[in-house]
Amino acid sequence: RVFRISLIRAFPALLFYPIQQVKQVMLGANGVAAHMQPGSTFIDMTSLNPIASKEIAAELASHGIQMLDAPVSGGEPKAIDGTLSFMVGGEEEVFNTFKPVLLAMGSSAVRCGSIGAGNTTKLANQIIVAANIQAVAEALTLAQKAGVDPDLVFQAIKGGLAGSTVMNAKAPMMIEGNDKPGFKVDLHIKDLNNALDCAHTVGAPVPMTAEVQEILQWLHSNGKGQADHSAIAQYYEHLTGIKLGRDL
């Protein structure tokens, strides 16, 4: 969503567009930047490759427009109840000015560094979430193949070191066979593509990210692109011929 041009000339513009559209929307011939006054601030809440964030910020700066990259974590449930977590990149003074705007939509907003740092942090977040989901799916598959109820395994370990917010949210969905989307497979593919691109650019090894990305791509190819990313468990079900929690 973008506020009407008439409303953003002297105040922040907040953008939620998909990655491929951001540059055109912001920097095109009749883009938002052409209608923003110098001294305005653009807050980008999409999940971009941080390199793209830096390119956009540099172009906006040539028009006298400041920028924050401020992707979020928490998914649809936290967006609905206003408890999103913002990870922000940009100048500290600009961040401090607009932190109250972000906290009107979320429960936390942390400045992680200069432009691009917000999206770098978001990519790190998405790597951890994807790897965690894969680990939960793999572990529960092992348990059931070994003859142990995966729900009891979940109940036993969720309070220990292996427990996590991701496990608490996704293990019950896997066990129930519920893939109603909170965060879709296709969106996670997009984020991990950005993570892989960024990693290759900066020279960071990300073999685990590449592996889980292939699983997500398999789900997409098998008609599950709009399913919740907990559908990673269905990849393991396909390989083993079981249904978690239902073939005991």
For each feature predicted by the language model, list its residue ranges.
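Rossmann-fold dinucleotide-binding core
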Residues: 48-126
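Beta-strand segments within the central parallel beta-sheet cores of soluble alpha/beta enzyme folds
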Residues: 151-158, 210-214
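Active-site-proximal catalytic alpha-helix in oxidoreductases
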Residues: 81-89, 103, 110, 114-146, ...
